[in-house]
Amino acid sequence: PTRRSSDLICYYLTPRKYKNLVLTILSLIFYSWGEGKYFLIMITSILVDYSAGIAIYRYKEHKKKGISILCLSIVFNLGILFIFKYVNFFINNINIIFSLALSKVNITLPLGISFYTFQTMSYSIDVYKGRIKPEINIINFATFVTLFPQLIAGPIVKYTDIQNEIKARNIEKDKVQEGIEKFILGLGRKVLIANNIGMLWSEVENTGFNNISTPFAYVGILAFSLQIYFDFSGYSLMARGLGQILGFNFPRNFNYPYASRSISEFWRRWHITLGSWFKEYVYIPLGGNRNGKFRTIINLFVVWALTGLWHGASFNFIIWGLLFFSLICIEKLGLIRVLNKYKVFSHIYTIFFLLIGWTVFAITDFESKIGRASC
């Protein structure tokens, strides 16, 4: 806390034209403190995507060159994400399928890589689409990529969300006060609620589903459902609060998701920035719902398979994503009309399948889970 307070004082005392430089340095120090060995990955990502944005814009009249540069940028970002997050999952499945004994790579997942790679990809795509002009000032671009409040756990901030604030922002007393309130509320959600509820879930997890009563297993998954909400929404709220203290307005990431009356509505309220990213950069480019029901279902399948994989390199995350894909398709095919008529039933239906979904999300040992479910 003392370190962060001194950082804020340093930031506030810095003249406006140097604020981005100071903020970038502070953000890189913050990242190095947590992930020093991957510092160069972050720097390389900044340099590659900064250069790609300028090159894409330079060749905006030459579509082939522009798309080639965009593809190189995307391949780079997805490449580093694959190497650090998915390569061992891939090796493990190759070994199983072909009865091989390939050695796994001894690497750990860099903090925030799933977030900042998506942010930089959206930047390059937006430049190619002509939605924005490239950022010429590399310090401004580095500020966008490295902003420490949301670097580790989101929300996913697109360049279009904060481009005006990167170039010029005002530190207003009311906004700072509001930011402090959000930060304290988010910290309370994380420390006072999520951590304590998480102790119950940890007890269930450590004991094992085969060694506890069925009611306690249900209490455990309910605890996990609450923990993941208060934990993640707490981090997002702290990030938004810190952003406001620094003069930025990050997008909202949660909007009372457990009040939803359908799975479709839940995903409009939960991790909003991730859903928005996949909608804008995957679902709509694939055709969205413009080419008939069959193509819509295919497009949704791709989005939800990728959404599951984004959360982790394990089959339970893929199954989790495909579960929600199936439910959303069923709702689109007519169930939503029934849910809209019966308020109580719609809430019960939504919570029931969310609990099933969080069970899949939380537990990779499906054999014990199925055994407990059959009791």
Put a short name on every predicted segment:
Residues 1-372:
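Membrane-embedded transmembrane alpha-helical bundles that form the catalytic cores
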